[in-house]
């Protein structure tokens, strides 16, 4: 049960505790870089000043007509590798392969892909494991899994690794 401030009790199967943040962009703004939900970058993670790169939680890239920041360790590593290749002169475009995990007490949440724009969702539940599979016109976009590493691994290693871009 979850007790609200009003004292009312609500039955829940799972409670997710999450926080969010805003990127610190003062230095980028002072450097006259473009800001759009973070430090705006192009496909090579260059800022509006091509001699400056941004990576990690602060980097905001074009995604489906908007600007997206992926706030996760995996994304920071992937973007850092792309920036390093570009600095070394190997022109490389960033290819977002979103994945995320967190453990909260005895619950494990894992996410692979992005579910924005989904048209259908399939729920798979077995005992204390549940996963949600997101599709757009029969194309798998993402999976959210709770205590179900098999579903997460299936999507992250077979589906996400096989695709070059996500729209």
Feature annotation, model-predicted:
Residues 58-151:
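Mid-to-C-terminal Rossmann-like scaffold of FAD/NAD(P)H-dependent oxidoreductases
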Residues 159-167:
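Single conserved hydrophobic/aromatic residue that forms the stacking wall/gate
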Residues 49, 119, 153-155:
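Short acidic, gly/pro-rich beta-turn/loop elements at beta-sheet edges
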Residues 1-3, 40, 101, 132-133:
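Residue-level detector of beta-strand face positions
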Residues 150-160:
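A short, polar/charged loop-to-alpha-helix boundary motif
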Residues 7-8, 107, 139, 165:
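Well-ordered beta-strand scaffold positions
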Residues 2-3, 8-82:
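FAD-site-proximal beta/loop scaffold in flavoenzymes
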């Amino acid at each position: 049960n979850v007790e609200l401030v009003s004292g009312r009790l609500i039955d829940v199967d799972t409670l997710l505790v999450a926080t969010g943040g805003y990127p610190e962009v003062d230095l980028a703004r002072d450097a006259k870089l473009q800001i759009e939900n973070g430090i705006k970058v192009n496909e090579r993670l260059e800022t509006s000043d091509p001699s400056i790169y941004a990576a990690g939680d602060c980097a905001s890239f074009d995604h489906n007509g908007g600007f997206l920041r992926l706030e996760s360790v995996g994304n920071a590593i992937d973007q850092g590798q792309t920036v390093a290749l570009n600095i070394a002169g190997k022109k490389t475009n960033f290819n977002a392969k979103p994945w995320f995990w967190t453990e909260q007490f005895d619950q494990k949440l894992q996410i692979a892909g992005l579910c924005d724009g989904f048209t259908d969702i399939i729920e798979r539940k077995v005992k204390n494991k549940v996963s949600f599979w997101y599709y757009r016109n029969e194309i798998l976009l993402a999976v959210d899994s709770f205590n179900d590493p098999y579903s997460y691994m299936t999507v992250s290693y077979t589906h996400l690794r096989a695709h070059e871009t996500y729209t």
